[in-house]
């Protein structure tokens, strides 16, 4: 970043999460990411610089090793003119969702992260003059807990995402329960993956956003957002997926375009184009491979059919590697929490050891190597407890990451394009796949995760599961005196 050339009018609001806000440059394929804080919890410039540097180091030394260097973009910490930051903050304030305005942009330190704009193809430094589509998916946790430490039997049958949906709707976070289940997407079975992606398109919540030429065209900020319009989305997608049957408008065209999008995303997600060391973890999938709450599974069950369990993900694909990192959570939060308390007790007695234990960094090769210890035999030491706590933090990071898929039609006769290509009904599409939202989850959030887990399971058990039991019981009573009649065929 060249200080003398910073003009807030060249930047626009791009989006924000719970802890940071992103602005994008109009011409260059870069974004700036600023930290956010509650008004009463400001940080010093030194603390903010260290926080941002930790994010960069964790991406570079841990997640890039696990997921592959082509997928992970670490960026760099930059220092910006304070006047530019203040003017930029004023410029974008009106574009921020009301639900995100409880935290303020850091305008005092001047530090930010400069990263590539992942809504663009990751080859050129400047915006290309051809249409570029980007699909952002937050897939969430792709497995059901298999730990013996789980006390709620329901957690061995229903995934966390599906249970959490009911609590989120009850508390007004979202208006409607999504039919999406992460286990369907991670199954590797194309039928289940198609259903999962269609469900995300129908009820995006904060798990799916679509950009066209860097501009958001489809997504949901919160419960106040307007209902998703698939017809309008299909209109945007025509330059990429004009249906091969020639239909130019109407419901059939919309269905054809959406179907084409789903098929292309599935093929990209199953593609293997990069190496990473997550395969070295060799964490075999244990426990249930089908979530009982998945509408896809329920529908087949009502038809008397079995859910196609698991075709298996190709080992080199990003979903497989992401799932491997997620499965570093071998104990579930229930089994992990007593180990967290062991570490806490040790730190209360020896607070000066916090730095030695690398709880706040540095996130270097030493930190990474300790994550590879997959033993689950508790020897009662602080070292064992700490390893499991750090693995849990990394696993939670992978459970909350986002996958960015950028697509662009190949130019006629272009042979120099080195990016992977996937066919569609209209043309070949060059694509790039990236991962973002890879900040290591804070050590301090573990007690919150423990309480939230209990709240989610308790609500689901008392409402949804209890209701299902009542329905099953009623059905049984209705058919207690039935007679089975056999007809000769």
Curated annotation (Swiss-Prot):
InterPro entries: Ins_P5_2-kin (IPR009286), IP5_2-K_N_lobe (IPR043001)
Pfam (any one): Ins_P5_2-kin
Species this chain originates from: Rattus norvegicus
Gene: Ippk
Domain of life: Eukaryota
EC number: 2.7.1.158
Renumbered ranges of motif EXKPK motif: 136-140
Family to which this protein belongs: Belongs to the IPK1 type 2 family.
Task of the protein: Phosphorylates Ins(1,3,4,5,6)P5 at position 2 to form Ins(1,2,3,4,5,6)P6 (InsP6 or phytate). InsP6 is involved in many processes such as mRNA export, non-homologous end-joining, endocytosis, ion channel regulation. It also protects cells from TNF-alpha-induced apoptosis.
Free-text comment on this protein's domains from its UniProt entry: The EXKPK motif is conserved in inositol-pentakisphosphate 2-kinases of both family 1 and 2.
GO cellular component, one term: nucleolus
Main enzyme class: transferase
Compartments, record wording: Cytoplasm; Nucleus
Name of protein: Inositol-pentakisphosphate 2-kinase
BP GO terms, sorted: inositol phosphate biosynthetic process; positive regulation of transcription of nucleolar large rRNA by RNA polymerase I
Keyword terms of this UniProt record: ATP-binding, Cytoplasm, Kinase, Nucleotide-binding, Nucleus, Transferase
Gene Ontology molecular function: any one: inositol-1,3,4,5,6-pentakisphosphate 2-kinase activity
Catalyzed chemical reaction(s): 1D-myo-inositol 1,3,4,5,6-pentakisphosphate + ATP = 1D-myo-inositol hexakisphosphate + ADP + H(+)
